């Protein structure tokens, strides 16, 4: 069994922590004006690893919320995986040099697979690929466009590239609290050797329990956003279950 990590999500829009519904920037809810305060709260709750996305950057194709990200890096000791607007090796190098533990390459993984290979070779274990699927097909450009390739097609391209993880998001569920699409995520994880992290729709403690079932043994973790912000998921209870599963493994 993979060591399961529950990643609390910080999505940045105009320097603030927001949650979107199905990736729609027009359907954003602000949950905290200060990302540093939010990251500190997650650290105090016992989380081990932050998942941060520069939403504006994902649409712009380059970092936009760099100041907010850097403030979190300076003020909060937790490792961070960061996505959004990372489309070239220079940006990968810059973020890893500033203390980001792992970068997530999304759109560029579809458009420029050579970048993923180069980045993973230059920074072993510090490059992840974000695959966000709508009706099975991978969406790009901040989910504004849908490609003609499936998540599995792209994941298989990187089997031998040495990437740290694939973050698989079901766009149809994202931000709607309908529960993780574990069937699709497990099917992907069972078809490749790369660790897979589930995202999109995390709703309650039931998702944590499902994540720890034997059938999900190849999953490396999950990302939770709105369920934590809305109080539907008790972080203490969730982390207790995960730590108990680790101890028993």
From Swiss-Prot:
> Pathway, per UniProt?
Amino-acid biosynthesis; L-histidine biosynthesis; L-histidine from 5-phospho-alpha-D-ribose 1-diphosphate: step 4/9
A single Gene Ontology CC annotation of this entry is: cytoplasm
Q: Where is the active site?
A: 11 (proton acceptor), 132 (proton donor)
Q: Which superkingdom heads the taxonomic lineage of this protein's source?
A: Bacteria
Q: Which GO terms describe its biological process?
A: L-histidine biosynthetic process; L-tryptophan biosynthetic process
Xref: Pfam families: His_biosynth (PF00977)
Q: Name the family the entry cites.
A: Belongs to the HisA/HisF family.
MF annotations from Gene Ontology: 1-(5-phosphoribosyl)-5-[(5-phosphoribosylamino)methylideneamino]imidazole-4-carboxamide isomerase activity
Q: State where the protein is found.
A: Cytoplasm
According to its UniProt record, the EC number is 5.3.1.16
Asked whether the UniProt record includes Isomerase among its keywords, one would answer yes
Reactions listed under catalytic activity: 1-(5-phospho-beta-D-ribosyl)-5-[(5-phospho-beta-D-ribosylamino)methylideneamino]imidazole-4-carboxamide = 5-[(5-phospho-1-deoxy-D-ribulos-1-ylimino)methylamino]-1-(5-phospho-beta-D-ribosyl)imidazole-4-carboxamide
Instruction: Report the principal subcellular site.
Output: cytoplasm
Q: Which protein, by its recorded name, is this?
A: 1-(5-phosphoribosyl)-5-[(5-phosphoribosylamino)methylideneamino] imidazole-4-carboxamide isomerase
Q: Which UniProt keywords apply?
A: Amino-acid biosynthesis, Cytoplasm, Histidine biosynthesis, Isomerase
Q: Which CDD domains match?
A: HisA (cd04732)
